Amino acid sequence: MKSLNIIFAGTPDFAAQHLQAILNSQHNVIAVYTQSDKPAGRGKKLQASPVKQLAEQNNIPVYQPKSLRKEEAQSELKALNADVMVVVAYGLILPKAVLDAPRLGCLNVHGSILPRWRGAAPIQRSIWAGDVQTGVTIMQMDEGLDTGDMLHKVYCDILPTETSTSLYNKLAELAPSVLIDVLDNLENSKFIAEKQDGSQSNYAEKLSKEEAQLDWSLPAMQLERNIRAFNPWPIAYFSTEDKDGNAQTLKVYQAEVLPHQDKPAGTILSADKNGIQIATVDGVLNLLQLQPAGKKPMSAQDLLNGRAEWFTIGKVLA
């Protein structure tokens, strides 16, 4: 089993966990590519990415080009003479010159079973769509968006209560060992590259704050999935009015689907210790954990203790 000289490209904590796994393996990380330091916190001080922090702790050279399209950046990368480049949530597009620079090309760790969800938000979209299974795909990168040949896939279940946070953590635990298995066997025939069937693919579009607004004209089951998919960001929300007619926005962290009823969508059916029940187009969404502006998330009962007038029975929410 040959030790590989690896360029690692990644930015968030999810990527840092993969970098740590490679550092713990027999392979050598000769350089790290990550996005530019970003302002963070109240003071808006520049903060290094988790990947950069880990690289610096291990005395690995760090490169932070704003783009890899320029010839200078491409020449710099090629001069590293890497065996392979591993890309995990890097955030920059890799042009063909970069894809071709390492001897064995570029590998990507993708947070779904391809080709089901290509694009930026595969973890969130798998919950949003009601998938019962997802996993991790290690892919040989090409110029397309997550269209490369698949080297290895490992599956995991999506539980009925799964949020994007919990599924992210599950995949972050699963994926690094899958990556190391591929790297260990990259130059033998253990993993045979498999072409993707593009007709089976969907685009996992980024989430937006606009999409997170609960639309009571949607099915209750879809709204419940939205609440789980949009946690930890952007968090599903809706608005009601207080006794003075002022709009009050509430974020929703947990809900359940109850049987069908015949009231117009958006009607508040009940509000008590068991939850705040709101009619949807085909059923009832029972809101269990909510967060008013400026407060921490709380149970429906705790919310109603001080704000029951926000949820008058029969009121129709927009």
Swiss-Prot record:
Name recorded for this polypeptide: Methionyl-tRNA formyltransferase
Originating organism: Haemophilus influenzae (strain 86-028NP)
Family to which the UniProt record says this protein belongs: Belongs to the Fmt family.
Pfam families the UniProt entry points to: Formyl_trans_C (PF02911), Formyl_trans_N (PF00551)
Annotated positions binding (6S)-5,6,7,8-tetrahydrofolate: S112, I113, L114, P115
Functional description taken from the UniProt entry: Attaches a formyl group to the free amino group of methionyl-tRNA(fMet). The formyl group appears to play a dual role in the initiator identity of N-formylmethionyl-tRNA by promoting its recognition by IF2 and preventing the misappropriation of this tRNA by the elongation apparatus.
Gene3D superfamilies (UniProt xref): Formyl transferase, C-terminal domain, Formyl transferase, N-terminal domain
The enzyme's E.C. designation: 2.1.2.9
Keywords: Protein biosynthesis, Transferase
Cellular component terms per the entry's GO annotation: cytosol
CDD domains, alphabetized: FMT_core_Met-tRNA-FMT_N, Met_tRNA_FMT_C
